[in-house]
């Protein structure tokens, strides 16, 4: 196993160990045991920077099911390294922050188990080369995030937010699964790199458009893009460390990673360019507009996150244009990839810090309601400093890193509007307009975020707690991120050669070696647009109290949340009615539906899939076998038309004993003896229960009732026979029976093959089966004891009365 595999598996292993440590070390905060895990992974990833800088990649394989083309393949290039550093680096700071945020009285064992589970899943997503493995980790991120969001499960809002996120992201996961299967059909491979190398085969496939749509749905749901963004604001009910980790730096960026990774395959389609770009721009505008009217600090950051993700998504869409040009022209549009990567890093720094500061304010005052907050400037000066740095970066104000990436974003929108491709040169003028409008609202909510908390009147009577500055443990992580905001803004070259260029080359597959970011490029359209953004933003802030009321009056029916909630109520009701229409309290009717569907499915498959039945090696049928089969069929037929319960029991036993005799003729005395014992016990139990069984009513005597039973029984029997013959005649693997014949005596020192298989080769299976029987027996015994106890208590009450 390689170090890369260990890096992915390490958090998963610790996720199993941490709950055990929690039981024995309750005096020490569990976070201190968790903190080394992401730090070690982060340090290991740092050692791989030189590898990706030189244009090399790391490919490691761990065999799993090689015959089916499914191995635990990990592939690390510049893009995978970037995300791995974010996952482990931000993860380290989040764990450190959580030590101060969560008290020892919380269920820390569960929390850190879920957090490490998510960390390992995210690393698996960004490093997997096998799309099936990627999908498994993808769904694991949804599952673990569900557990983290619902961590405070006593809150109804937490349960609601967790369910909504799970439903939407799992829907996207199923779409992703469909997409990757359609990708694998033309290439006959599950390797992402192989698919990229054979992208032309996929593009010529009839499944290309369908695969592209399904992949985009999977990415859009994960990254909370329009119209799937509604799950993210409700996910803010999670503890603040979860929000800072999942919803700013990791999970919500999994969709961006997927779009970036799949761009070499789908960039040839104008549908990909237009859809990814427009969805990103619409998300940017809509979410930034909604962020301005939020009354909860986390609500502001939630919609802010959605808008910033939309900005990055739009840049990835614009960058796809580079695949349609060569040379320097290609590099012009590939600059959008560079801007997307840079802003992805910047967003993780300032948004992670802002989430942590929000948690600090909530921890200090007991509320996140902007109507109750204000005037905390002198009470929380350190938090104020960190907030100003990171919020101004989010607003795109120099000299912070957010200004550089925002300028790059505006430049890419102007550049894209000039592309003579896919009608972008005519309709592309919308790109900079939407980008500027979205940036104006981004500026507004960023400045208002600072003002809501630290300026205005201090209202101690409305605060659940007396406000105070939080501990150093809660300030250290956001302070580190705020420092990075300044450093990356003043010295972006630290990132360009080591991180941004290799990551961009992984998407564009061309050598990107001239990436530069500057605070001032001259009087460019992007710079002039920035001045317009500042002016309009200040005007909107001054008039904020007037126009924000119009936004807050938005009718509920015009929101996607309204339709989600309505669907969540209507669909279960219709499902219940539909289920009740065919599922009854009469088990016979339920079995008719189940077996009828099985028969229909079997025969549809038989007539639609080519097969052959081979009778070459079938043993000859002897006369006494025919006699036993006739006896067996006669008994089974009589059961269907029996008029008494006793006669049915006798005939059913006759069928079982006839099968036992067949086993004897087939030289399987052990099976025959077992069948004989089972039938004897079953018959005895039936006779013991005979007194309590209801009589066969007139409904059972109806001819239609009996004919239906006969058809279903015969159909199931025929289906099993046909499936058995087809399986016998269409063997794709060598029979395992030869292995048992050769090794039964050598390995197990037994001559009875059946006994040896059951006791030795499949001993654990037999043990568990016996355990299940034992548990079932204990359950029946317990139920009988409880019934007797209740009867005794009832008699005592009657005697007392």
Swiss-Prot record:
Keyword Transmembrane helix found: yes
Membrane topology: Multi-pass membrane protein
Main location: membrane
Coiled-coil segments: none
Disulfide-linked positions: none
Gene Ontology MF: a single term: antiporter activity
GO biological-process terms attached to the record: proton transmembrane transport; sodium ion transport
Any Pfam family hit: MbhE
Assigned protein family: Belongs to the CPA3 antiporters (TC 2.A.63) subunit A family.
UniProt protein name: Na(+)/H(+) antiporter subunit A1
Source organism (scientific name): Staphylococcus aureus (strain MSSA476)
């Amino acid at each position: 196993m390689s170090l890369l595999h260990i890096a992915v598996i390490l958090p998963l292993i610790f996720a199993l160990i941490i709950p055990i440590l929690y039981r024995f070390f309750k005096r020490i905060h569990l976070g201190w045991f968790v903190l080394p895990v992401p730090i070690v992974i982060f340090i290991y990833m740092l050692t791989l920077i030189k590898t990706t800088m030189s244009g090399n990649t790391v490919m490691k394989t761990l065999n799993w099911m090689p015959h089916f083309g499914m191995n635990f393949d990990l592939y690390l290039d510049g893009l995978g390294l970037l995300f791995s550093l974010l996952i482990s680096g931000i993860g380290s700071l989040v764990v450190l922050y959580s030590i101060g945020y969560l008290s020892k009285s919380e269920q820390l064992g569960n929390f850190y188990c879920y957090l490490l589970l998510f960390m390992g899943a995210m690393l698996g997503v960004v490093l997997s080369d096998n799309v099936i493995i990627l999908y498994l980790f993808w769904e694991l991120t949804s599952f673990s995030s569900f557990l983290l969001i619902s961590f405070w499960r006593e809150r109804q809002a937490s349960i609601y937010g967790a369910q909504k996120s799970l439903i939407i992201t799992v829907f996207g996961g199923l779409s992703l699964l469909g997409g990757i299967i359609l990708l694998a059909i033309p290439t006959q491979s599950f390797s992402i790199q192989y698919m990229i190398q054979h992208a032309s085969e996929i593009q010529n496939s009839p499944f290309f458009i369908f695969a592209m749509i399904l992949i985009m749905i999977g990415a859009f749901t994960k990254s909370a893009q329009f119209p799937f963004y509604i799950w993210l604001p409700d996910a803010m009910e999670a503890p603040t460390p979860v929000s800072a980790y999942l919803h700013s730096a990791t999970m919500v960026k999994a969709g961006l990673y997927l779009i970036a990774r799949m761009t070499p395959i789908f960039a040839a389609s104008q549908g990909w360019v237009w859809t990814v770009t427009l969805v990103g721009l619409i998300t940017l505008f809509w979410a930034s507009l909604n962020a301005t009217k939020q009354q909860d600090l986390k609500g502001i950051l939630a919609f802010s996150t959605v808008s910033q993700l939309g900005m990055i998504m739009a840049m990835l869409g614009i960058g796809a244009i580079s695949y349609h040009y060569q040379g320097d022209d290609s590099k012009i549009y590939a600059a959008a990839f560079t801007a997307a990567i840079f802003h992805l890093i910047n967003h993780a720094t300032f948004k992670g810090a802002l989430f942590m500061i929000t948690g600090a304010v909530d921890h200090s005052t007991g509320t996140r309601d902007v109507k109750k907050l204000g005037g905390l400037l002198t009470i929380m000066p350190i938090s104020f400093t960190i907030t100003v740095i990171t919020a101004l970066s989010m607003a795109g104000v120099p000299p912070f890193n957010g200004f550089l990436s925002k300028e790059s974003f505006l430049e890419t929108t102007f550049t894209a509007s000039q592309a003579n491709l896919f009608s972008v040169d005519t309709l592309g003028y919308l790109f900079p307009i939407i980008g500027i409008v979205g940036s104006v609202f981004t500026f507004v909510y960023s400045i208002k975020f600072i003002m809501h908390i630290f300026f205005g009147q201090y209202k101690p009577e409305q605060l659940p707690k007396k406000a105070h500055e939080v501990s150093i443990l809660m300030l250290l992580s956001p302070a580190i991120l705020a420092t990075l905001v300044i450093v990356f803004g003043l010295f972006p070259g630290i990132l360009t050669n080591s991180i941004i260029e290799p990551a961009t080359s992984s998407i564009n597959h061309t050598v990107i070696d001239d990436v530069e970011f500057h605070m001032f490029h001259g009087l460019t359209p992007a710079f002039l647009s920035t001045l317009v953004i500042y002016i309009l933003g200040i005007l909107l802030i001054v008039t904020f109290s007037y126009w924000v009321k119009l936004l807050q009056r938005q009718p509920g029916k015009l929101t996607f949340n309204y339709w989600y909630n309505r669907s969540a109520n209507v669909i279960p009701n219709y499902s219940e009615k539909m289920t009740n229409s065919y599922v009854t309290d009469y088990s016979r009717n339920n079995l008719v539906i189940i077996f009828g569907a099985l028969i229909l499915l079997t025969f549809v498959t038989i007539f639609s899939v080519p097969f052959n039945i081979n009778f070459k090696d079938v043993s000859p049928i002897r006369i006494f076998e025919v006699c036993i089969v006739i006896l067996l069929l006669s008994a089974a037929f009589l059961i269907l038309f029996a008029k008494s319960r006793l006669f049915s029991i006798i005939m059913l036993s006759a069928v079982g004993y006839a099968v036992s005799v067949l086993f004897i003729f087939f030289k399987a005395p052990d099976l025959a003896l077992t069948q004989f014992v089972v039938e004897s016990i079953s018959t005895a139990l039936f006779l013991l229960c005979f007194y309590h069984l209801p009589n066969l009513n007139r409904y059972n005597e109806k001819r239609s009732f009996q004919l239906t039973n006969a058809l279903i029984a015969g159909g199931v029997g025929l289906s099993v026979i046909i499936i058995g013959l087809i399986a016998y005649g269409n063997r794709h693997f060598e029979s395992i029976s030869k292995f048992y014949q050769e090794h039964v005596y050598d390995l197990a020192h037994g001559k009875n093959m059946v006994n040896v298989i059951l006791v030795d080769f499949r001993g654990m299976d037999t043990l568990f089966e016996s355990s299940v029987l034992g548990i079932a027996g204990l359950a029946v015994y317990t139920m009988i004891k409880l019934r007797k106890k209740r009867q005794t208590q009832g008699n005592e009450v009657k005697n007392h009365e």
